[in-house]
Amino acid sequence: MKTKLYLPIISLLAMSVFAFISCDDSDSDTTKPVIELSEPEEGQELKIGDEHGVHFEMDLSDDVMIKSYMIEIHSNFDHHSHGKSRAAATGEATVDFSFNRSYDISGKKTAHIHHHDIIIPANATPGDYHLMVYCTDAAGNETYIARNIVLSTTAEGDDHHHAE
């Protein structure tokens, strides 16, 4: 009778010890993913109103597994002097451009990303912007890369177009 009582207790104790050993942090993923952004380049001028979109290309990698990446573009006008903007000088109505989109790429250790999803509308305010790319792995480690870009009506359009 006592054997029947001790067996469940010993089994529960053994499972608890196994669970604590399995939770050892020495095997957890603490390495951030790597971003190698090819396009757009630092300081690159991007054409406002180009219906083909911005040529965006990068390679992502992680030692275990990538989960997602996010692209963010926002204005960087605050570092300028307080002169008149092009919109104020010409009387044209423009809007500060922003872009924020996440992409799920779960299940891969490496990914080559190439697309033209970023469309800069014709009424975007020309000037300096920040392009931020964030990458998160399956363990929640995040890394980012930042680029300074310029939106311009006089920039040359991108000749690098592919059918998706």
Regions found by a protein language model. Give the residues of each.
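Surface-exposed, short loops/turns at beta-strand junctions within beta-sandwich domains
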Residues: 110, 122-127
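Bacterial Sec-dependent N-terminal signal peptides
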Residues: 2-5, 15-45, 156-164
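Extracellular acidic, Ser/Thr/Pro-rich low-complexity tracts
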Residues: 53-65, 75, 137
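Conserved structural position at the C-terminal beta-strand
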Residues: 133-135
